[in-house]
Amino acid sequence: MNNLVKQPHEKELFGHPVGLYVLFFVEMWERFSYYGMRAILTLYLAAPIILGDPQSGFGWSNGETLSFYGTYTMFVYLTSIPGGWIADKFIGQKKAVMLGGILLCIGHSILAINAQWAFFTGLIFIVIGVGFLKPNISTMVGGLYNQGDDRRDRGFYVFYIGINLGAFLGALIVGAVAAKYGWHYGFGLAGIGMAIGQIVYMYGLKYLGTVGEFIGKADSPNKDLLKKPLNKVEKDRMLVMFLSFLIIIVFWGAFEQAGGLMSLYTDQKTDRILSFSLPFIGNEIPAAVFQSINAFFIIVLGTAVGSFWHKWKNKGKESSSLFKMAIGVIIMAFGFLFMSKAASEILMNGDVVAEKSAMIWLVLAYLFHTIGELCASPVALSFITKLAPIKYASFMMGAYFAATGIGNKVAGAIGGLSENAGDFEIFTGIAITCTVFGLLIIAILKPLKRLTHGAEDIQAIDNN
């Protein structure tokens, strides 16, 4: 039975396939580039036009900025559907990740050029590149583990820490460089990170074996699965996956205020002045640097949250992926109450009582958002790889990221309402909506779990 989860030729490091760490570092650098660019995107668009100044931006209003941000991030993830489909039908995940990495290197390099045409052209390359890379590298992580290997969830937690290590370093370093030297130096630095990731991937291909190969190849043992119709169990699992995407849309619609409304709130309405001076940045913390807080908490808490759920499951308590995702939405909702408190410091009974709110409320909000994210996001990635039929593995992962993209668009639309509704009303409304939604998912959990037909109940006998 041991061969169910571990094959003799599989090389391991710290209890996981070596290939996991290859993908860990590739995704770390890809996320360094993406989140580094994202940390300064809305700030760049909203910055005033100052000819000849490296800090000159587009001079857009908050509403215009948040609308564009939502649309851009939506398309970044919507392209995961064709990216996953092309991988499933024509080239396989391994080549799709390679192609995506090349396009991302080109896109980020173009962004370093200080010209309007370069900005929009670079974003187009990034949108297409992420569409090829993002769903397929996640599917490859799942492909490292055989059916029934309960290391899969923990493997995705490790992978997720890599994502957020890159996000932390990207937001911190790119944000600081952009604040000191100019926006396009920040964009260029993000491109260097992506180039490093591409080099790591090319070197690490030998550790991935056949994982990510196109199953339609003549010598593929799974070739016949492309023609085999879905059975009832597979159809039910597809249905519950699509239903779970609604959770994803709600979660990211709230969470992605971090790159939109919360980013602008940090820049315009948060007291970022320290009583002491820090090397390189002085005594005022750049607004973009605050986006590294979430990633920092994930690096610190990722293993602990994963271990908590593992122990929780061993005690025989409810630990399905859908339950964890619902709990994640509720925990994230509590984070927005701290943003409500921040907004209330500025506005009390309709009157302005303070010019800016304290930084501590942002930190506490990001803490709860992080715990919620750790309960929902890596679990959702693993959930898709457990339930998706092999012939649609990358397509369904692409659909997951498309749901993330829709959530990003929703985030931009919600954030844009703050110009009329007010920050306090938006933050409080998000908190209430997410709490009610999470409780509703828990209430209908049993029928949803039946549709999975025990996909998460298969346990490995021995992982040693």
Per-region residue spans from a language model:
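Cytoplasmic membrane-interface "Motif A"-like loop-to-helix N-cap segments
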Residues: 89-101, 311-330
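Short amphipathic helix-loop junctions that connect adjacent transmembrane helices
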Residues: 39-64, 258-287
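Central cavity-lining transmembrane alpha-helices of secondary-active solute carriers
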Residues: 66-87, 292-305
